[in-house]
Regions:
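Post-transcriptional modification and biogenesis factors for structured RNAs
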Residues: 1-123
């Protein structure tokens, strides 16, 4: 199935946030990519309380690390668009394309500078 967008989370470190994003992705029918490692288990009660039963309705693609995700995106002709405060690009003027993947960094640390320098664009 071809999707207009996908969401990617880089090493999320708050289980309840991951649960809520899975619910959002399920409702919008967006695939969700998760770049590991995770500092918590999917059996964590905070995660389970936030995700409820939506995990069964979300297409989740797990990647063991950034390199695996990056190779996946190249193989599938996806642009990686980083959501960051370190850009002058205006979200509302940005020209998205089909199959873009919007990347969000860790809640507590964002993404490393090497990833900032690797992505296709920033919003």
């Amino acid at each position: 199935m071809t999707h207009k967008f996908a969401i990617c989370l880089y090493q999320p470190d708050m289980p309840q946030n991951l649960g809520v994003i899975i619910r959002t992705a399920a409702c919008l029918e967006f695939p969700l990519h998760i770049i590991k490692p995770l500092p918590f288990s999917m059996t964590d009660k905070r995660f389970k309380g936030a995700v409820m039963d939506y995990i069964d309705h979300c297409e989740i693609v797990n990647h063991e690390n950034w390199d695996n995700f990056y190779l996946y995106s190249k193989k599938n002709n996806n642009r990686i668009i980083l959501a960051t405060t370190k850009t002058d690009n205006n979200l509302y003027e940005f020209k998205f394309k089909d199959n873009d993947i919007i990347l969000f960094g860790k809640e507590t640390a964002g993404v490393p500078e090497t990833i900032h320098n690797t992505v296709n664009n920033k919003i």
